[in-house]
Amino acid sequence: MSLSDVNFKKKLLIVVPYRNRDQQLKIFQYHTKIYFNEDKLDKHLNVKLCILEQANDKPFNYGRLCNAGFLINEDYLDYIVINNVDFLPMIADYSYSDSPMLLIKHGHNNLPMRPSSNSKWIVKGSKRENFFGNSVLLPKHIF
C-alpha cells in the first residue's frame, strides 16, 4: 500500500463559515464541486463540505463556527480544512498531512498571505490582525 492510497482513504472535512455572503457562497460551492470532481489528484479524496452560516446580528464569530463544524462532524473526519468563503480551491494539495498547512498562499493582487490575515484591509494593531482565515489544513489530532 502506497502513501497515496492511505491519503485517499482519509476523510477530509472542509468547513466554510460565513454570514451575509450569499453570492460568494454560490460561487464557492459551484467551484468546489467542479474542483474536487475534475481535478486530477483531488478527485479521489473523500471530501465532505460543511457550510456554516451565522444568522444573528451579533459580531461574526468565525472561530465558533469552525468549532461547531468540527464538533458536528468529529466522527466523520480525519483532517479538516478551514476555508474562507472568499478563497476558492485552486492549485493546492488537499491530501492528508500530519502538520498544519496553509493551502492558499496568495490572495488579492497575488500578494503573499499568512494564516493570520485574510484581507488586504487589515490594519496593524486591530483586533483582526490575529484573525485565523484563508484556507488552512489541520489534522484532527491538532484541531
Q: What does each model-found stretch correspond to?
A:
Residues 21-36:
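Short, well-formed alpha-helical segments that are part of the catalytic scaffolds
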Residues 20-23, 87-89:
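Short acidic, S/G/P-rich loop/turn micro-motifs used as interaction or catalytic elements
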